[in-house]
Swiss-Prot record:
The keyword Magnesium applies. A motif (Nudix box) lies at residues 38-59. Disulfide bonds: none annotated. It holds the Pfam family NUDIX. Keywords: Hydrolase, Magnesium. This is Nucleoside triphosphatase NudI. Its cofactor is Mg(2+). Gene3D superfamilies: Nucleoside Triphosphate Pyrophosphohydrolase. The keyword Magnesium applies. The gene is nudI. It comes from Escherichia fergusonii (strain ATCC 35469 / DSM 13698 / CCUG 18766 / IAM 14443 / JCM 21226 / LMG 7866 / NBRC 102419 / NCTC 12128 / CDC 0568-73). It comes from the Bacteria. It catalyses: a ribonucleoside 5'-triphosphate + H2O = a ribonucleoside 5'-phosphate + diphosphate + H(+); a 2'-deoxyribonucleoside 5'-triphosphate + H2O = a 2'-deoxyribonucleoside 5'-phosphate + diphosphate + H(+); dUTP + H2O = dUMP + diphosphate + H(+); dTTP + H2O = dTMP + diphosphate + H(+). It is an enzyme of class 3 (hydrolase).
Length: 141
């Protein structure tokens, strides 16, 4: 089984948290709401990977004022690729508390939508298992 280390920002701005809706035809959690983030490349430093993933997935106009390592988690997930093939992967999630100075987001093709969500409204979203676990650990669900 392949192993992936994932950097995952829990981005907050003015009391709301950023959720991204995965595209229906790709990813580990197609069509569900998730946190952004992605894999650490070989030889890449963890914070560099976090900043790269944010830039790739959310655009280069989102300004992070603060990045704090928070916790980690792991599990086994079935990834569905765009061509319909599937792969079981051991995932290690490195989760960071992030505070943004703005809300300027330009999502890439991995996502179909995004939302800034107040804590009291998070439970109304179809959150993927990993995001639900993270938000519960944080005391937000």
């Amino acid at each position: 089984m392949r192993q992936r280390t994932i950097v995952c920002p829990l981005i907050q701005n003015d009391g709301a948290y950023l959720l991204c809706k995965m595209a229906d035809d790709r990813g580990v959690f197609p069509g569900q709401w998730a946190l952004s983030g992605g894999g650490v490349e070989p030889g890449e430093r963890i914070e560099d990977a976090l900043r790269r993933e944010i830039r790739e997935e959310l655009g280069d106009k989102l300004i992070l004022q603060k990045i704090t390592p928070w916790t980690f988690s792991d599990d086994v997930r079935m990834k569905t690729y765009a061509d319909g093939t599937k792969e079981e992967i051991y995932m290690i999630y490195l989760i960071f508390d992030c505070v943004s100075a703005n809300r300027e987001i330009t999502i890439n093709e991995e996502f179909q939508d995004f939302a800034w969500v107040k804590p009291q409204d998070l439970a109304q979203y179809d959150l993927n298992v990993a995001t639900r676990k993270t938000l519960s650990l944080k005391g937000l669900l």
